[in-house]
């Protein structure tokens, strides 16, 4: 990055989104997190609220029940963000917008159906405790697992 990010909007409420927002705030940048529904989906919500409260006390701003609708680059290079917050249209200008809205499994091109591997509609696989798919000699680990936490340490430990 050749220039500092300045006033930043982080769209998303995953651990990656909050980690990015946290370090940007710690570096002194005005940082806002746009949350569609809840922080840290899939995690303990008491802990998620505690993390959100802590981040608020350290300077991160949160916009809850919000979704971006339109982004427009202004002549000065800043980004005008139009969003809905609790159904009401609002706007704000940011220097940088970071989308951290999740991942999806890109498994369709692997032709695994020919091997008999069954995938969910989102491309992810159900596995047993040993990370075996429905085909005993075919395994899956990491972010392609259906219903599992998408955490790097979990994937590393598995395989």
Language-model-derived ranges and their functions:
Residues 11, 18, 41-42, 58, ...:
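Thr-Gly-centered strand-to-loop micro-motif
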Residues 1-5, 91-158:
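FAD-site-proximal beta/loop scaffold in flavoenzymes
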Residues 5-9, 15-88, 149-156:
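Rossmann-like dinucleotide-binding cores of NAD(P)H-dependent redox enzymes
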């Amino acid at each position: 990055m050749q220039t500092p990010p300045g006033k930043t909007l982080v769209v998303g409420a995953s651990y990656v989104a909050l980690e990015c927002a946290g370090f940007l705030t710690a570096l002194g940048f005005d940082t806002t997190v746009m949350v569609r529904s809840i922080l840290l989906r899939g995690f303990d919500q008491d802990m998620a609220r505690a993390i959100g409260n802590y981040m608020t006390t350290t300077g991160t701003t949160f916009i809850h029940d919000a979704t971006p609708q339109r982004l427009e680059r202004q002549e000065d290079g800043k980004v005008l963000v139009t969003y809905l917050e609790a159904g009401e249209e609002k706007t704000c200008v940011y220097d940088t917008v970071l989308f951290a809205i999740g991942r999806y499994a890109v498994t369709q091109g692997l032709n695994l159906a020919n091997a008999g591997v069954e995938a969910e509609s989102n491309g992810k696989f159900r596995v047993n405790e040993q990370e075996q798919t429905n085909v005993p000699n075919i395994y899956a680990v990491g972010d392609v697992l259906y219903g599992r936490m998408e955490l790097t340490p979990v994937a590393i430990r598995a395989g």
